[in-house]
Amino acid sequence: IDKLNTTVDSVSQNDDYIAIRVAGEIPRYEIFCSLEHATALWESLSDKTRATNSAYWDYLNISNGLPFIDSNTREEFVPQMANMELINGVSFEKGCYTGQEIVARTHYLGKQKRRTYPIKIISDTPPKAGDQLATGTSTENQYTGTLVNVYQTAKNEYEALAVIQIKAAESDKLKLKDADAEITVLELPYPLEDQK
């Protein structure tokens, strides 16, 4: 690709490649091409870029508030809970998909009670996607949030994305439901729309 677009969500393409600019301060691209072209591209970029592992890519997604829903959390959330409409992950203007009526109703009636937030966790027990969050006032069978993605940043320290009840995220009483942990809600790199 001769020239890559730098605008978030923009697409650059030629006959051999398609590259999509991913959100975040550090420029990242998802590149789609054949294996043959991927090998050539890798060699041409090796002196201009720094290779990292997929875990670092996951960390950058967490840092940029971009959730990745996997088998631990699928079918747990409507798109708005994962902030999808805020990161161009869902459109209310077009498309047809399973559950669209519920998603649109939630959007247009403004009854959103949960959102995705970045959090910092300090815990001796490693947290994982799908773990539940609670508050000090939660009963044994209640939970106020679910971990979506987790990345270990240091010994016993983690950054994560979690879908959390808006009221619970505004309190200072979050905890992992099944482990002793200190949890701090961090700021998203994009604004949440009016939380009705």
Predicted features along the sequence, with ranges:
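Short, catalytically relevant binding-site loops at active-site mouths
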Residues: A38, Y59, L66-I69, L109-K111, ...
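Short, low-order "capping/linker" segments at domain edges
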Residues: I1-Q13, P67-E76, E193-K196
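Acidic, low-complexity central loop/insert segments
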Residues: I1-N64
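Residue-level recognition of beta-strand microenvironments
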Residues: V11, V22, G65, G95, ...
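Short, conserved active-site entrance elements at the starts or edges of catalytic domains
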Residues: N53-S54, Y59-E85
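Helix N-cap / beta->alpha transition motif
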Residues: S34, D70, Q165-K167
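Glycine-rich, small/acidic residue-mixed loop/short-helix segments
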Residues: A82-V90, A104-K196
